Amino acid sequence: MHSFLGLVGLLAGVSVSSAAPSVQNITSDTYFYGQSPPVYPSPEGNGTGSWAVAYQKAKAFVAQLTSEEKVNLTAGVTSDTGCSGMIPAIPRLNFPGLCVSDAGDGLRGTDYVNSWPSGIHAGASWNKNLARQRAYHMGTEFHKKGVNVLLGPVVAPLGRVVEGGRNWEGFSNDPYLSGALVYETVKGIQSAGVGACTKVRFPQRLQSSGSNLVQHFTGYEQETNRNPETVDGVDIASVSSNIDDKAMHELYLWPFQDAVHAGSVSVMCSYQRINNSYACQNSKTLNGLLKTELGFQGYVMTDWYGQHGGIAAANAGLDMVMPYTELWGSNLTDAISNGTMEASRLDDMATRIIASWYQVNQNKNFPAPGIGMPADVNEPHQAVIGKSPDSRTTLLQGAIEGHVLVKNTKQALPLQSPRLLSVFGYDAKAGDSLIVNDVSFVNASVQKNHTLYVGGGSGTNSAAYVLAPLDAVQQQAYEDGTSVLWDVVSEDPDVDATTDACLVFINAYATEGYDRPGLVNKESDTLITNVAGKCNNTIVTIHNAGIRLVGDWINHENVTAVIFAHLPGQDTGKALVELLYGRANPSGRLPYTVAKRAGDYGSLLHPSQPEGKYGLFPQSDFSEGVFIDYRAFDKQGIEPQFEFGFGLSYTSFNYSGLAVKKVNRTTEPYPASAPVQEGGNPNLWDEILTVSAKVQNSGSMDGDEVAQLYLGIPNAPVRQLRGFEKVGIPAGQAVNVKFSLTRRDLSVWDTEAQQWKLQSGDYQVYVGRSSRDLPLKGQFSI
């Protein structure tokens, strides 16, 4: 991308290496000036849409503040709580301060809370209603613990880099699926206790209990070089995500647009650089894309220690620094005095923060910030119960629906009254301890000696208990009178020749701070082939924090069933047993593409590394544009092991009766001009097309099907997900599934007009079971 971003100062900061005279090493960031267009000034929040009352109150509040009090709202401070970050109180105006804490799959570092299914698990459920329920119940736990801001959900990384260490925190590699689920998640968190959600009655005693923070804005796709570092006395900058305008809008910005449209009150900017400008002081992305184009009314917070500039960051659109700042404080008021920053910018920063507090009604009967977040749970503290019996059904259902059955031969599953089960693999058992601890970062491909139910880093969570697979299998065996043998240590275990089934448990670990060392693990694969060599009914379960390749053994005749179990949270074993024994029917679908071999992912397999003249300023060129995951496989004609959207069931579904109907709305190329609302031009959400199809359960077991709609848009990838509905269908019955498509769904980003544009020509419509199993095909024209 270096050749076409309009380099300014081409020769600035270039030196000739004596070790390699032919290589000109870039030694100053002035070389990159101008690659990310400047957008100033930072737009003031205007209280559009549902924010009007909150802004009215916030402006009146901020008008009473001293300059010092305004500044204090913009940066975290140390506290005697276990909150990840704290904004100080303003006692004279009855503002109690703010507690912000991880994570997007449940609270971390405290007690009396639940470990919820992770983002990738929710993504694999393909269930919008369940995503909202999960978010609501998580939100109530944060509320009870006095946490004002939930640091989640995550929609970046999107999953561009297959080995990305934090891909598991997000929902999917597809922007549409990720966007649909983040919309429901934001709604669930921020409306906890106020609104109603399908199949859930929300107690009225909680009033808009929580707010969320969507992260990480944007283009944050690898851990390698995510932060600047010093190696042998040499400073190396953060990696730069070099993203063109089209890919930015059609991939990386898409789910953030859905989050803003849902009303998210805050957004976290990311660590890395975007087009060679640090994300937390990138005026193009913060002022231009987020606050102007998307009409974002909330505030922008740094990731922890993610501030790299002082007044420049404030002018570029940053509103809050965590966990503290060394660059703001009195420097903000000094900047106003010397004219390098407008007083209105500080007012807007404070107003956005306070408006967000009012927007979720935290001025009314909210617990004291951090009341349930002790700094050290091993010291005497008040027991504040976050978890609730009301959440148990959602907790278990969420764990169940994120499992994806990808192989099931010889009628291996569901299990039919086995006399003897044999359990193998390090992932089968619970760990040797379960204590409340802080974040940990371990660079490993697997987690040995315990079942993997959540990933590593700041996105991990605290559990009320962990019901591991081996424990759950034994509980079921006790009820049924089944014998159970196990060896969860050996790589080549003995197998009783009369066993009915061998259950093998492995995992694929990932964590913040490191990109994954690979997509396979030799010891785990050897274990599987060793067991399969002795057992003709080997059922493999993989708890995977990301894509896991299975090509070395997937076609082994004795490997009869395989489940991608992802990261189910604390109900991991209970959920799995419900599926193994057929009390629940598998309904998860892959939110990513599983290749046959690592090389099929091409340049998207590994993170970018510092190299050549960019050794001090690592570059990650997103030169593939919009072609990641299944889009890339489709473009290159590569057959995957398991395609995006794939998943098996214990029943079967038939599709028929496709109907495509254009709604009576204008189909002019560009949307009509309108005042920007949350999420952008409101006309982007006009319904343009409806599609319906009949889905019949032709099997003998009740089940849930995920009907998926893909569009072939002219001048775009051959197929893109643009609709999905998860429907429960009793055996032998049929339902009519309807999809509603908006102007945005049918458009591509016009880089010249800087607008979403409908294409002239024939659109292809596909409906079916996955991105490559699409029995229904139709067409319409614009």
Swiss-Prot record:
Known function: Beta-glucosidases are one of a number of cellulolytic enzymes involved in the degradation of cellulosic biomass. Catalyzes the last step releasing glucose from the inhibitory cellobiose.
Catalytic residues (UniProt): 303
Organism whose genome encodes this protein: Aspergillus terreus (strain NIH 2624 / FGSC A1156)
Compartments in which it is found: Secreted
Main location (coarse class): secreted
GO cellular component: extracellular region
Glycosylation sites per record: 25, 46, 72, 275, 331, 338, 443, 449, 536, 558, 654, 664
Name of the protein: Probable beta-glucosidase M
Keywords: Carbohydrate metabolism, Cellulose degradation, Glycoprotein, Glycosidase, Hydrolase, Polysaccharide degradation, Secreted, Signal
InterPro entries in alphabetical order: Cellulose_deg_GH3, Fn3-like, Glyco_hydro_3_C, Glyco_hydro_3_C_sf, Glyco_hydro_3_N, Glyco_hydro_3_N_sf, Glycoside_hydrolase_SF, Ig-like_fold
Pathway terms, separated by semicolons: Glycan metabolism; cellulose degradation
GO molecular function, one term: beta-glucosidase activity
PANTHER family attached to this UniProt entry: BETA-GLUCOSIDASE (PTHR42715), BETA-GLUCOSIDASE M-RELATED (PTHR42715:SF5)
Source superkingdom: Eukaryota
GO annotation, biological process: cellulose catabolic process
The family this protein is said to belong to: Belongs to the glycosyl hydrolase 3 family.
Uppermost EC category: hydrolase
Record's signal peptide: 1-19
Gene3D superfamilies in alphabetical order: Glycoside hydrolase family 3 C-terminal domain, Glycoside hydrolase, family 3, N-terminal domain, Immunoglobulins
EC number, UniProt record: 3.2.1.21
Catalytic activity: Hydrolysis of terminal, non-reducing beta-D-glucosyl residues with release of beta-D-glucose
